[in-house]
Amino acid sequence: MKIEDWRNKELEKLYVNVFILEEETYVRIKEEIKKQKIYIFIGLNLKGYKEIIGVYTPEEETTGYWIQEIANFKSRGIEDIFMICMINNKWIKKVIKMNYPEVIMAPSMIEIYNKTRKYISNKDHRIVMRELGRVYRALTLEEAKVVYNNLVNEYKENKLIIQIINKYIDDIFRLFKYSHHARVITGNSGNYNRMRNNISSKIKKVGLFESIKELKYYLNEILKEEESKWKPSVKRWDKIINEMDCNLSEKILDLI
């Protein structure tokens, strides 16, 4: 399978979650070394299996670029998406909402981890991420707010850490109108973290690619290897899918 094959293969009608992995690397283009964004879209289907549904290396990231690529999802079969797990990207977010207006936008703990670790000491970063994870997995909003308030109180003298926490907390709190299971499957699991770290470390291992073609070939090889290892994403999947929110059930019925 080539990168283009992932962008053209037939897809399922409904995905419970689409996890967007964002990476950066460097590519030599006409004797210049340029930063290159990589986006890997991974879908979680109704049977609890992950699959790569698209790999993108935009030369220039614009709304127009993503309008073309996300519209391609519909032509390949995706009629609805229950939840998207991503870091905030204004282009992708806008275009996905245009095509799938009822989708739930969930902040990705894995991407928050990677976006923030360079700005906080290792010790504090472990604590902040552990406690944000507890907020995300809390059974009720009230329980989540207790964990959040304790965390903010612990770091009340550190303005940077408080700003980082508050940048994401409202998006996490908004998810509490959905079931506990709907929140937990949005990319917080150890399986997703290992998957993300495996892909990230292999990309960083190269550092500089001599061309976009070389980058695409390398991505093709490492993603084929990674995808071959994937098993059902969540244990007791049948029980979880039965306890998901009623609006997921409505989406399924609409497609039957």
Where are these regions (language model features)?
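Extended amphipathic alpha-helical interaction segments
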Residues: 95-191, 195, 201-209, 226-227
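Structured, non-transmembrane catalytic/binding cores
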Residues: 17, 110, 127-135, 162-168, ...
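Basic, amphipathic alpha-helical segments enriched in Lys/Arg and hydrophobic/aromatic residues
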Residues: 197-256
